[in-house]
Amino acid sequence: MELLFTNCTILPMTAEKEPRTFTGAVGVADRRLALVSDDPRRIEAFRREHPGVREIDGTGKVLMPGLINTHCHVAMTLQRGYADDIALMKWLHEYIWPFEAQQTPDEIVLGAEMGIVEMLLGGVTTFVDMYWHENRIAEAVRRLGIRAMLGASYLDTSWEAFADDVERMIATTGDCDRIRFCLLYTSPSPRDRSLSR
């Protein structure tokens, strides 16, 4: 689907090359930016190249690159407000880990979906996540259209269990170009140091 956003205030994030903002148009073709311009001739050329393009009037709106959340545990949206103002290790050992031990994979997906929708509504288009059942969180990423770097998390996990988790993640979403995988520590103090070595 081709889109053309017109009459928007564009914040291109290239201040050293261009003015900080300008009024113009942004064209999208084949899921890629194909036009960022205030030149009426280039905007009209985009229309001719893409007959039937869907136009969206951005008058009074700002168009900018999506924000990136570089550290989150998106499924923990369900735990917001559960235990606040507590020292980290007490918070983890006495509240969070016991709570998480009771969670089902479906509840983790629900928390992830809520967190992803919240991020999208706030302009976040990419996030880096580290949590349990990332292969299931990847399903939510696929459904909701956001980009993600999902971290295979480990805490008291054997190398074999960790490798199985990574294989599940890749099998679940290996063909989705919006998802990347990485290795991330979930906790400041994994008790099994062999995996981190």
Model-derived regions: residue spans:
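N-terminal metal-binding scaffold of metallo-dependent hydrolase/deaminase domains
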Residues: 1-47
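Divalent metal-coordination and catalytic microenvironments
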Residues: 8, 26, 31, 60, ...
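Short helix-terminating capping/connector loops at secondary-structure junctions
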Residues: 19-20, 49, 175-180
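Active-site gating loops and adjacent loop-to-helix segments of metal-dependent hydrolytic enzymes
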Residues: 78-110, 117, 144-152
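Mid-domain alpha/beta scaffold segments of enzyme catalytic cores
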Residues: 126-184
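Conserved small/polar residues in nucleotide/adenosyl-binding loops
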Residues: 185-192
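Hydrophobic alpha-helical segments, chiefly the membrane-spanning helices
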Residues: 196-197
